[in-house]
Amino acid sequence: VPLRNNYYLTIQMVNKNIIWWLSGIMLLGALFRLSIYNLEPLFMDSAYYASLGRSIAEGDYLLQVNHMSDKPPLFFYVQALFFQLLGVSASVAVLPSFVGGMMGIGIIYFLGRDLKNSAAGLLAAFLFAISPMSVWLSATGLIDSLFMAVTMLSFWTLLHRRYYWTGLLIGIALGMKQTILSFGPFYLLCLLILELHHHSGKEAFHSVTKSIFKMMPGFFIVFLPVLYWGMFLTSEKMKLLKWTTGFVSGKHDPQFVGTSLDRLSFLQSGLGEVVGLSWHWIIGLFILSMLLLMGKIYQQWSLKRQLELNDKLHFCYNLFTLFFFFLLLFVAQKYLAWYVFPVFPFLILTGSITLVELLNTRYLSWNRNARGKIIIGILGTITLISAFSSATARVNQIGEDLRNSPYQGVQEVIKVIKPYLMNGNSFIF
């Protein structure tokens, strides 16, 4: 009994320490985001999204105002809710993005914890908290930050086989941005891995089918209203998947913008925004992660043992990252800086799990003793300090760029967007 009491006391102390560490990381993430919060005046996309949220808050509940948005309406309703609660202003318009960024820090901790352990979760949360692009998207009025928080949460519920909630969250993500459709193969592969790990033969097939049906009620609760709005209420009368097919087939942009080689250089630059370090670090950790996973697969195969579920899912995450890179380089009609952001959480998870794995691995002969672990620990600490220093410098640079950006007045904005609006002076603050 005394031993059991000591065990529970130790667990409570560990949990309390984790709470303190995670709270500190959340505070750090908030400080990074507040340092550049709403520094740039709302313009173009962010101003336009806010205008639609304002229209809803002022009584256009079905959002029938003439508009040119290529996004589903759910994010605009979230902005409208904040406007109703806190008043209509530019700073409130940015608040949903800030909340999404803070949610993402907590959610990626739970993903890292459940895929590896608490150390990997805390490391992932720290890296996501200081990620320059995550910080930037959290401090502007764009959709991506909240969208990725919901997407990460959907994968966490999938990991725990809470399929109704997974379906609901996929529906919410689709209600904000069609990018979630590119995650379709990822969801299916993760589902197959989960069910085939717990079942075999015909039972696995029935379990997969049953799981998909469990997702459907939650998904359609959100999807059907969005579909009805898109087809019958909005002035654009959006056709089903119109913008997605345009993204792939080029109906709206028949020219493939740039070359794949040009996009590769843009991708390298974008990867530098993951944690502020050079893309060489990100790709290096990614390749090392794949090598470690392949080593585990070979070892378990030679021993005729089943690979652990967490390793299967981690390998799946890496495959999806490669698939998304392929879409950006060879399929998408155009490439913008933040298009790579949807894979940032998975790159951060991969890097965090790999660094923690290096402290425990037995594959490398020079890491079989305490001395090897100390060396790896020192290298890991240097990497984290470098990441923090680089991320801080990059966020400061972003802040300077935002402070020095030319202010776009009401008349300039109206001049650009007025042809697409019925009432040109009702959409901006």
Regions found by a protein language model. Give the residues of each.
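Specific aromatic-rich, kink-prone transmembrane helix
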Residues: 107-110, 126-127, 136, 146-165, ...
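Short helix- or helix-capping micro-motifs
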Residues: 26-32, 124-129, 156, 170, ...
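Transmembrane-lumen/periplasm boundary regions of multi-pass, lipid-linked membrane glycan transferases
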Residues: 184-199, 203-310, 323-330, 387-393
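Short acidic/glycine- and proline-prone juxtamembrane loop motifs at membrane-interface regions
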Residues: 43, 133-144, 336
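Membrane-proximal, lumen/periplasm-facing interface regions of secretory-pathway glyco-
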Residues: 373-420
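Transmembrane alpha-helix segments characteristic
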Residues: 20-30, 170, 285-295, 301-330, ...
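Transmembrane-helix motifs of polytopic, lipid-linked glycan transferases
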Residues: 23, 27, 95-115, 153
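Short periplasmic/luminal acceptor-recognition loop of GT-C membrane glycosyltransferases, typified by
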Residues: 166, 407, 418-429
